From Swiss-Prot:
Keywords: Chylomicron, Endosome, Extracellular matrix, Glycoprotein, HDL, Heparin-binding, Lipid transport, Lipid-binding, Oxidation, Phosphoprotein, Repeat, Secreted, Signal, Transport, VLDL. Residues 79-254 are annotated as: 8 X 22 AA approximate tandem repeats. The keyword Secreted applies. The modification Methionine sulfoxide is found at residue 142. InterPro entries: ApoA_E, Apolipoprotein_A1/A4/E. Residues 1-18 form the signal peptide. It comes from Bos taurus. SUPFAM superfamilies: Apolipoprotein A-I (SSF58113). The gene is APOE. One of its GO terms (biological process) is high-density lipoprotein particle assembly. This is Apolipoprotein E. APOE exists as multiple glycosylated and sialylated glycoforms within cells and in plasma. The extent of glycosylation and sialylation are tissue and context specific. Glycated in plasma VLDL. APOE is an apolipoprotein, a protein associating with lipid particles, that mainly functions in lipoprotein-mediated lipid transport between organs via the plasma and interstitial fluids. APOE is a core component of plasma lipoproteins and is involved in their production, conversion and clearance. Apolipoproteins are amphipathic molecules that interact both with lipids of the lipoprotein particle core and the aqueous environment of the plasma. The modification Phosphoserine is found at residue 146.
Length: 316
């Protein structure tokens, strides 16, 4: 019975091939490697193990029919997905701890963006797992349905998956760009607030120095000038520290943006390669079934063809 289900899947994939060629690009081998060096984060290593398992599934040959129809693949992907999301959560908490000295508004915004990125990654991985489970369920139920209906539904699923990954990646890039601009504006506002706060003190010190100089003479004026210069130096030091903090924040944002963009591109390319690999697995079976079907139709037509009858003889 499993062999018959696989044969029906092959026929549907063959019918969907023409529709998918218009949506997907040329086939690309799934060779992208996740970062595994000492500098990579634990959540990146967990995500790499997730993709390693997907690559292992794609290397199956003779056992691929049975593996696609049982629940072992779904269970393994679920375990790897939970491990990855656990590492992502730990990394997010670590980043939130490092952002303690930042303003409360900026810290809340960073936490919100990190949660959005975490949710997006989890949603994409969950969608991949559910897609495999859905294919398995539809294969088990397709014997009582219309072939054209299943072919159209499967073609729609295979077209929407790359588009969805691209849309998610673009949306995440836009969110990070907006956050980066907002963080820069917030840091600039903080510097402006510092200037506004210490500016009146400097002016007040200058005014007091001028007043004291008129009352106490030149020595007191020199002391006031020294005090003013000292206060001005402290103000400049505070400004430099704030600027350094802003530069560090911008650098961290650029690193996060680059990592998210790289992960989005990798997920899109690997999803497309995985779908193309599925088609390549079943192409020999499709051709063999088409030849067998053509031979069967020809035999049936020959069997049902009426034999010619001899015409009646004429009596002269």
């Amino acid at each position: 019975m499993k062999v018959l289900w696989v044969a029906v899947v092959v026929a549907l994939l063959a019918g969907c091939q023409a529709d998918m060629e218009g949506e997907l690009g040329p086939e690309e081998p799934l060779t992208t490697q996740q970062p595994r060096g000492k500098d990579s984060q634990p959540w990146e290593q967990a995500l790499g193990r997730f993709w390693d398992y997907l690559r292992w599934v794609q290397t199956l040959s003779d056992q691929v029919q049975e593996e696609l129809l049982n629940t072992q693949v779904i269970q393994e992907l679920t375990a790897l997905m939970e491990e990855t999301m656990k590492e992502v959560k730990a990394y997010k908490e670590e980043l939130e701890g490092q952002l303690g000295p930042m303003a409360q508004e900026t810290q809340a915004r960073v936490s919100k963006e990190l949660q959005a990125a975490q949710a997006r990654l989890g949603s994409d991985m969950e969608d991949l797992r559910n897609r495999l489970a859905q294919y398995r369920s539809e294969v088990q139920a397709m014997l009582g349905q219309s072939t054209e209906e299943l072919r159209a539904r499967m073609a729609s699923h295979l077209r929407k998956l790359p588009k969805r990954l691209l849309r998610d990646a673009d949306d995440l890039k836009k969110r990070l760009a907006v956050y980066q601009a907002g963080a820069s504006e917030g840091a600039e506002r903080s510097l402006s607030a510092i200037r506004e706060r210490f500016g009146p003190l400097v002016e007040q010190g200058q005014s007091r120095a001028a007043t004291l100089s008129t009352l106490a003479g030149q020595p007191l004026l020199e002391r006031a000038e020294a005090w003013r210069q000292k206060l001005h130096g402290r103000l400049e030091e505070v400004g430099v520290r704030a600027q350094d903090r802003l530069d560090k924040i911008r650098q961290q944002l650029e690193e996060v943006h680059a990592k998210v963009e790289e992960q989005g591109n990798q997920m899109r390319l690997q999803a497309e390669a995985f779908q193309a690999r599925l088609r390549s697995w079943f192409e020999p079976l499709v051709e063999d079934m088409q030849r067998q079907w053509a031979g069967l139709v020809e035999k049936v037509q020959l069997a049902l063809r009426p034999s010619p009858t001899s015409p009646p003889s004429e009596n002269h």
